[in-house]
Amino acid sequence: MKTDESAQVVPDPYPALPIERGPHGRGVGRWVVQEKHRYLARYLDATREAQKKFKQRVLIDPFCGPGRIQVEGESFTRDGGSVAAYRQSVESGAPFTKLLVGDIEGKRVHANELRLKAAGATVQSFVGPAEETVSAMTKAVPFGALALAYIDPYNLEFLSFSIIERLARLQYVDFAVHFSLMDLTRNIDMELDPKRDRFDHALPGWRLAAPTNELSKSSLPAWFFDTWCKAVQALGFKISGQMPLITDGKGRSIYRLVFFSRHPLPDRIWNDIARSANLDLFASY
């Protein structure tokens, strides 16, 4: 099985360059390919006809990594998110005309850029924290282009709300955001301490607004997520009720994949492809 699967994977044109192998170096979870990349690929394919109506189609990935991953337990490597997205866009007949990729580590950005160019993409790269590079990324989007912002930070600490606010200024932009439930659930009670600030950029002012006298600690993560969603809606976006729950294969929730847009068509398409065993969160609000 592994042999057959590896034969279908496009070889790495730069095997000597950095490869993402997860925080412990043993490989990323299989859910990265089976869930995160699969949903992105299905969305790009399902929206191909709508995308063709735009002369310029841009992917924005401010947490791009090196563009190549190794899944735990596999001997071979695979495309990272931005490279996989570009290949899917080509296969679907509506290739991205420009990819804007960024990472805090220059070597990882350079590796991603080279791998994308090897696949035939037009790329512009940015080095630095996403909350700093996103302004330049926004300016690099051609006027009137359709943009897809793929926001995939390692944890909630780096999901600065200012990233979303700045990208929201674009005329045509849809978002696919990985919201770290694991980080939120594990640490929100500690973050109530005003001396700590890990979540302050993700949802400014949350600590003062949190109804700690009314909610149990176990209810705080749901309140935080709901309040974050309302902040996104206040920017003029509709959040899809279908939010795939990404787990680690051991029953532990890692992310919610949150999609939001201003136009009803991409929202309807996302709902169709993401509808599964995942619960519609907004049914309970």
What are these regions (language model features)?
Residues 156-170:
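A short, conserved alpha-helix within the catalytic core of class I
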Residues 2-57, 74:
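Class I SAM-dependent methyltransferase Rossmann-like catalytic core
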Residues 264-285:
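Flexible, glycine-/basic-rich loop-and-beta segments that form/coincide
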Residues 171-186:
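Conserved beta-strand signature within the Rossmann-like core of class I S-adenosyl-L-methionine
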Residues 133-142, 165:
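Short amphipathic alpha-helix with an adjacent loop that forms part of the alpha/beta core around
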Residues 35-136:
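SAM cofactor-binding core of SAM-dependent methyltransferases
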Residues 188-249:
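A conserved mid-domain beta-alpha-beta active-site/ligand-binding segment of alpha/beta enzyme cores
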Residues 53-54, 140-145:
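Glycine-rich phosphate-binding loop signature in dinucleotide/nucleotide-binding domains
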